[in-house]
Swiss-Prot record:
Sequence positions that bind FAD: 17-46, 285-295
Alphabetized UniProt keyword annotations: Aromatic hydrocarbons catabolism, FAD, Flavoprotein, NAD, Oxidoreductase
Gene Ontology terms: biological process: 3-(3-hydroxy)phenylpropionate catabolic process; 3-phenylpropionate catabolic process
InterPro entries per the UniProt record, alphabetical: 3-HPP/3HCI_hydroxylase, FAD-bd, FAD/NAD-bd_sf, PheA/TfdB_FAD_monoxygenase
Catalytic activities: 3-(3-hydroxyphenyl)propanoate + NADH + O2 + H(+) = 3-(2,3-dihydroxyphenyl)propanoate + NAD(+) + H2O; (2E)-3-(3-hydroxyphenyl)prop-2-enoate + NADH + O2 + H(+) = (2E)-3-(2,3-dihydroxyphenyl)prop-2-enoate + NAD(+) + H2O
Origin superkingdom: Bacteria
Family membership: Belongs to the PheA/TfdB FAD monooxygenase family.
Top EC category: oxidoreductase
Annotated protein name in UniProt: 3-(3-hydroxy-phenyl)propionate/3-hydroxycinnamic acid hydroxylase
One function term, GO molecular function aspect: FAD binding
Associated pathway: Aromatic compound metabolism; 3-phenylpropanoate degradation
Length: 554
């Protein structure tokens, strides 16, 4: 598809494997992952620097695991507040829903507050590790065109200079108003909320109470959130007839803050900004050699803090697939599984966010009264209370089709779900999280068994070419048993007993884990070879010259 562009001779030409439009969190994460895989990447950003004001304030365990996968989590954690509870309050201040999950099944706290600009800066700095990755600011994408084997981008600098980029693939991470998506005429279906909200960020937190509170005041609903580094965020609904200019006036801002602070004059304002909450989903995530990710593919209200995290899921799902395709290890049909796996879950998170917004600010007054009464009764039912406390209402990513092989009923299968990340003990005695032992790779993990036993030599060659790590998990007391060592297999001890419980629950002894930490397949030693062949087929992996044997049997 050709797009018209200015007929001006470009002054600079770039040639890369992947061009990324947008240096927001999703674009930066994509660039970090592809960079560590050796892919030649160019990130282009219209602005002259990263956005420096707070935006998203919630980062979950899955997103922290994604940060871990690119070696940045230790630099991100200082800008987070772990175990950040969310509490819904009635107009009288009674907590009717306390969301405070204490699980760390994926290695990190499930709910965390964070300062997005500082985390974005960590990701930008992370790109300096890779000589194959560049990030250019003050570059406006004016036009682009797709050919059979490449995408051509036409850029303009602040000085009016033109530049051309030739890339094998274009990943559009250019936000909810995505130029790329609009140019390709991809429908962005959904709705815009009728109410706006004004966000007020304050330094030297004048409240300094922990957690986040959503106060369901029928007169003017508001949010109060404690953020890292002594930042307090307030969000107030903008009422009909009010404008941003009016609310920003000192006397009106004072009136707003007097609702939540005893002394609204003694504050250090960082910024005030009005937001409109949208709930929209792109009809397609892949258009030939262009892929949409993050807000360019879906936008949602902020009430569950899942806009940022959904973008991180996009980046993790897409990046490893794109790397395999560029490296010639898989055909580009693998990229079709990106939309197949991500779009339905993005829609589920949009629906959850819209529902949470309706709980905070019901469209009709009687709905708020009903909410308060029903919630008061339900809080006396322990199963209901645990349902909210443990955040069980959050739709966990589960893929029913795509780059995976499932045997049996999907409902109870671990295939298509994220694998746990407990602590494990290495043979040198060090204790670490499982992903640290695996790296940014596929893994075949076996409980007690040699994971190579059920594979032919050709299969071992094929999966090692993907960087696959072969892991044998044993009870921690067996970690130093020499006779159980196998060449090419990493042995780890089950420090917390969680891996034993996982394998026992799912009636399997082997799991194939994808680089994004999702379970691609389960097996036992005698069926592993057959399962790996099926998985190689659905992932359209390229094969060695020799025919791959089906499986090894006793």
């Amino acid at each position: 598809m050709a797009i018209q562009h200015p007929d001006i001779q470009p002054a600079v030409n770039h040639s890369v494997q992947v061009a990324i439009a947008g240096a927001g969190p999703v674009g930066l994460m994509m660039a970090n992952y592809l960079g560590q895989m050796g892919i030649d990447v160019l990130v282009v950003e219209k602005l002259d620097k990263l956005i420096d004001y707070p935006r998203a304030i919630g980062i979950d365990d899955e997103a922290l695991r994604t940060m871990q996968s690119v070696g940045l989590v230790d630099n991100v954690l200082p800008h987070t507040t772990p175990w950040h509870a969310m509490r819904f309050l009635t107009p009288k201040g009674r907590c009717f829903a306390d969301i405070q999950p204490m699980t760390d099944e994926f290695g990190w706290p499930r709910r965390n507050a964070f300062i997005q600009p500082q985390v974005d800066a960590v990701m930008l700095e992370g790109l300096s590790r890779f000589p194959n990755v560049r990030c250019l600011f003050s570059r406006e994408l004016e036009a682009f065109s797709q050919q059979d084997d490449e995408v051509t981008l036409h850029l303009k600098t602040e000085e009016g200079q033109r530049e051309t980029v030739k890339a094998q693939w274009l990943v559009a991470c250019d936000g909810g108003a995505s130029f790329v998506r609009r140019t390709l005429n991809v429908p962005f279906e959904g709705k815009t909320a009728p109410n706006q909200w004004i966000v007020v960020d304050i330094a030297n937190d004048p409240l300094s109470t922990p957690h986040i509170y959503l106060c369901c005041d029928p007169v003017r609903p508001y949010v109060s959130a404690a953020l890292p580094h002594a930042v307090r965020r307030f969000e107030f609904m903008v009422m009909p007839g009010e404008t941003e200019e009016q609310l920003r006036e000192p006397q009106n801002m004072r009136k707003l803050l007097s609702k939540v602070l005893p002394n609204p004059d003694n504050v250090e304002l960082i910024r005030q900004r009005v937001y409109t909450h949208n709930a929209r989903l792109a009809q397609r995530f892949r258009i030939d050699r262009v892929l949409l990710a993050g807000d360019a593919a879906h936008i949602m209200p902020v009430w569950q803090g899942q806009g940022y995290n959904s973008g991180m899921r996009d980046a993790f799902n897409l990046a490893w697939k794109l790397a395999l395709v560029i490296q010639g290890k898989a055909r580009d049909a693998l990229l079709d599984t990106y939309q197949q796996e991500r779009r339905d879950h993005a829609k589920a998170m949009i629906d959850l966010s819209v529902t949470a917004g309706n709980v905070l600010a019901p469209p009709k007054r009687w709905q708020g009264t009903l909410r308060d009464g029903v919630s008061w009764l339900l809080n006396y039912l322990p199963p209901v209370k645990r349902y909210f406390l443990e955040m069980r209402f959050k739709p966990m990513p589960q893929y029913y089709g795509g780059a995976l092989v499932r045997e049996g009923e999907a409902k109870h299968s671990p295939v298509g779900k994220m694998f746990i990340q407990p602590k494990v003990t290495l043979e040198n005695g060090d204790v670490t999280l499982l992903d640290n032992a695996i790296g940014a790779n596929f893994a075949v993990i076996g409980w007690g068994c040699n994971p190579l036993w059920g594979m032919s030599d050709e299969q071992i060659q094929q999966w090692r070419a993907l960087g696959t790590r072969f892991i044998q998990v044993v009870p921690e007391v067996q970690i130093h048993t020499a006779q159980d060592n196998h060449d090419g297999v990493l042995r780890v001890g089950d420090t917390q007993g969680r891996l034993r419980s996982w394998f026992a629950q799912h009636n399997a002894s082997l799991v194939v884990m994808r680089p994004d930490r999702f379970v691609a397949a389960t097996a036992i030693p005698q069926t592993l070879g057959k399962t790996l062949n099926k998985l190689a087929s659905v992932m359209t992996l390229t094969r060695p010259d020799a025919d791959v044997s089906v499986e090894k049997v006793a």
